[in-house]
Regions:
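Surface-exposed amphipathic alpha-helical tracts and adjacent flexible/coil segments at the periphery
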Residues: 2-10, 14-36, 41-48, 66-67, ...
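Glycine-rich, positively charged N-terminal anion/phosphate-binding segment
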Residues: 53-69
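Gly/Gly-Pro- and Ser/Thr-rich, intrinsically disordered tail segments characteristic of DNA damage-repair
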Residues: 91, 125, 130-137
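Alpha-helix capping/helix-boundary segments
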Residues: 114-115
Length: 448
């Protein structure tokens, strides 16, 4: 991992109880993949009433089917209804709540105190999990929610391991869930970190300096100031930013904040992604019973690799085995902004950000295909092509249990005609595989 960190404390090799591995389900395919690759449970958003409304890959009918499918696999599904509702949405929310409750999900992820109280009154048999959006950071708040009837707290990402342990010690009779992997938000609504970042005054503690309202100057390292001409529309001005530019605020002109820009945007606060796979024993020791992976908008490949890596790490930990670095290496092949352990071991400060790799650091491998079916008689697998594949190239077949290297010898279209090359987005192809991949598998190829 690229971050310079203090040494990570590993627990002893004594056998540890196995926590829940909770994966995101952005759509039906990702749900099935997550469960196949090792998730104990998944979470999905209810259309219109969760915080990923625009990216939800479920409709009401498919979400009900997802609940049924998950239960048939002997696993759990939690449904997010964690909006903070305005008056206009309350009646609709309650109607949808009644429909969802009839499906008997294993829990509802909620934030709004009033809606939580109504849900507990209308459907007391369905566990309520308090969303991380509720910003739970201390044991007194956990105590309050437990007394109200909430069964699980999804902890704020800003907590240190020691703080989690104290919460568990003082309120032991409630489940604690913690994020272990995925993107990290800098701010949510009024819960802003800009003042803390720029002026060391925490808005969440009542000391906001309104840093977002300050006047800022854009400066080049040679000392010149760029004057941006105002236009009729604030969206019409775009200036490419080369290396060496900084932002400063007149009252703190000596403090220069570097700006980096690539083809995907300009980054003032670009958090690294969370990866706490090496801290799982410490999180269990602190009282966490569910490890949550962020990423409902990520790909099925992301769901597969995070599920498999954390499943293996949890199983090793539960069996008393030391941490296997191969689990982290697999995560490093995913697209990310490089990794940080967040606040679990310290305040990350500048090490929590990554400007050099603003968009994707997972460049060593690319996904070339997703398995759609397998014919045992011919040993041929039908794949959706995601990226260019060529015969005689070296590929890896990724299954829930194995990584199988092989040389691509035979590839054909669905008519049985031989192919030398297949391109992403084209029609599906059939490939001769070294073994039966099972129901779910991917192909990947090294890019170096």
């Amino acid at each position: 991992m690229k971050e310079t960190t203090s040494p990570i404390r590993h627990s002893s090799s004594a056998r540890t109880r196995s926590p829940e591995l909770l994966l995101p389900a952005g759509d039906p395919e990702k749900l099935r993949v997550a469960l196949a690759f090792g998730a104990d449970a998944v979470y999905a958003g209810v259309p219109k009433y969760s915080l990923r409304t625009r990216e939800i890959g479920f409709r009401r009918e498919s979400l009900e089917e997802a609940v049924t499918y998950t239960h048939r696999q002997g696993k759990k599904i939690y449904l997010a209804m964690n909006i903070y509702a305005h008056n206009l949405k309350v009646d609709g929310f309650l109607n949808e709540l009644d429909r969802v409750a009839a499906w008997e999900p294993d829990g509802l992820i909620m934030s709004d105190p009033g809606l939580i109280a109504l849900a507990l009154k209308r459907h007391p048999h369905i566990p309520i999990h308090l969303s991380t959006q509720a910003n739970t950071t201390n044991w007194t708040t956990v105590h309050f929610w437990r007394d109200l009837g909430v069964r699980r707290i999804i902890l704020s990402r800003e907590l240190h391991l020691n703080e989690i342990a104290e919460i568990h010690q003082k309120v032991p009779d409630i489940e604690l869930e913690a994020f272990v992997h995925g993107a990290i938000c800098i701010a949510y609504s009024g819960r802003c970190l800009i003042s803390n970042y720029l002026n060391h005054r925490d808005a969440n503690q009542g000391t906001c300096t309104n840093s977002c309202r300050w006047e800022y100057k854009l400066a080049w390292e040679k000392g010149s100031i760029l004057e941006v001409e105002k236009s009729q529309s604030p969206y019409e001005t775009t200036i490419p930013i080369p290396d060496g530019f900084t932002l400063s605020e007149p009252k703190h002109h000596h403090e220069k904040m570097p700006i980096f820009e690539d083809t995907f945007g300009t980054y003032l606060m670009n958090s690294r992604d969370l990866c706490a796979i090496e801290l799982l024993p410490d999180l269990v020791k602190a009282g966490v019973v569910s490890f949550k992976v962020e990423g409902r908008t990520k790909s099925a490949w992301y769901a597969a690799m995070t599920a498999r890596s954390y499943r293996r790490a949890i199983d090793d930990m539960s069996a008393g085995q030391p941490f296997n670095p191969d689990h982290l290496r697999d995560l490093l092949t995913l697209s990310s902004r490089t990794y940080t352990t967040g606040f679990y071991t310290r305040n990350p400060r500048q090490y929590g950000e990554n400007f050099e790799d603003g968009y994707s650091a997972g460049f060593r491998y690319r996904v070339t295909g997703i398995l759609k079916s397998y014919d045992e008689s011919s040993s041929m697998g039908t794949f959706e092509v995601k990226n260019r594949m060529k015969t005689e190239s070296e590929l890896e077949l990724i299954t829930p249990r194995e990584t199988i290297p092989f040389t691509l010898r035979v590839m054909e279209n669905l008519k049985g005609e031989s192919l030398e090359t297949a391109h992403g987005g084209a029609e599906n192809v059939r490939i001769l595989l070294p073994q039966d991949p099972g129901d779910y598998a991917f192909l990947r190829q090294k890019t170096e």
